């Protein structure tokens, strides 16, 4: 029974390996460069920051622990 499980496991790994593309990274790079070439998502240039209520944050001030 253990041998059958082992053989089944090896065959399933082989099948997954056959259907998994080894050049997936290249396809991803093509997708990303195409995305960057097109200029990204439409509407990004129309971005307006949302209003944040509360205390103003000054990045030059040290935080409560005294670290900068």
From Swiss-Prot:
What keywords appear on the UniProt entry? Cleavage on pair of basic residues, Secreted, Signal
What is its subcellular localisation?
Secreted
Q: Supply the residue numbers of the propeptide(s) excised during maturation.
A: 27-38
Q: Where is the signal peptide?
A: 1-26
One Gene Ontology cellular component annotation? extracellular region
Q: What is the tissue localization of expression for this protein?
A: Expressed in salivary glands.
Q: Does the keyword Transcription apply?
A: no
Q: What does this protein do?
A: Horsefly salivary gland immunosuppressant protein that likely inhibits the host inflammatory response by regulation of anti- and pro-inflammatory cytokines. When tested on mouse splenocytes in the presence of LPS, it increases the secretion of the proinflammatory cytokine interleukin-10 (IL10) and decreases the secretion of the proinflammatory cytokine interferon-gamma (IFNG) in a dose-dependent manner.
Q: What is this protein called?
A: Tabimmunregulin 1
Organism expressing this protein natively: Tabanus yao
High-level lineage? Eukaryota, Metazoa, Ecdysozoa, Arthropoda, Hexapoda
């Amino acid at each position: 029974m253990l041998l059958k499980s082992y053989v089944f496991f090896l065959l399933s790994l082989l099948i997954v390996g056959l259907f998994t593309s080894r050049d997936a990274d290249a396809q991803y790079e093509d997708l990303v460069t195409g995305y960057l070439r097109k200029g990204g998502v439409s509407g990004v240039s129309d971005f307006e920051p949302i209003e944040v209520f509360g205390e103003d944050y000054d990045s030059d001030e040290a935080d409560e622990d005294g670290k900068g």
